[in-house]
Amino acid sequence: MPDPAKTAPKKKSKKAVT
């Protein structure tokens, strides 16, 4: 699963997934 922050840099809601 690729980093959600890289697939959707506009979405900061899932940025704390790492």
Curated annotation (Swiss-Prot):
Highest rank taxon of the organism: Eukaryota
GO MF annotations in UniProt: DNA binding
Main location: nucleus
Residues recorded with modification Phosphoserine: 13
A single cellular component GO annotation: nucleus
Subcellular location: Nucleus; Chromosome
Entry PTM: Phosphorylated during apoptosis; which facilitates apoptotic chromatin condensation.
Keywords for this protein: Acetylation, Antibiotic, Antimicrobial, Chromosome, DNA-binding, Fungicide, Nucleosome core, Nucleus, Phosphoprotein
In-chain residues carrying the UniProt-annotated modification N6-acetyllysine: 6, 11, 14
Example of a GO biological process term: defense response to fungus
Function: Core component of nucleosome. Nucleosomes wrap and compact DNA into chromatin, limiting DNA accessibility to the cellular machineries which require DNA as a template. Histones thereby play a central role in transcription regulation, DNA repair, DNA replication and chromosomal stability. DNA accessibility is regulated via a complex set of post-translational modifications of histones, also called histone code, and nucleosome remodeling.
Description of how the protein assembles with itself and partners: The nucleosome is a histone octamer containing two molecules each of H2A, H2B, H3 and H4 assembled in one H3-H4 heterotetramer and two H2A-H2B heterodimers. The octamer wraps approximately 147 bp of DNA.
Family to which the UniProt record says this protein belongs: Belongs to the histone H2B family.
Record's protein name: Histone H2B 3
Organism: Ictalurus punctatus
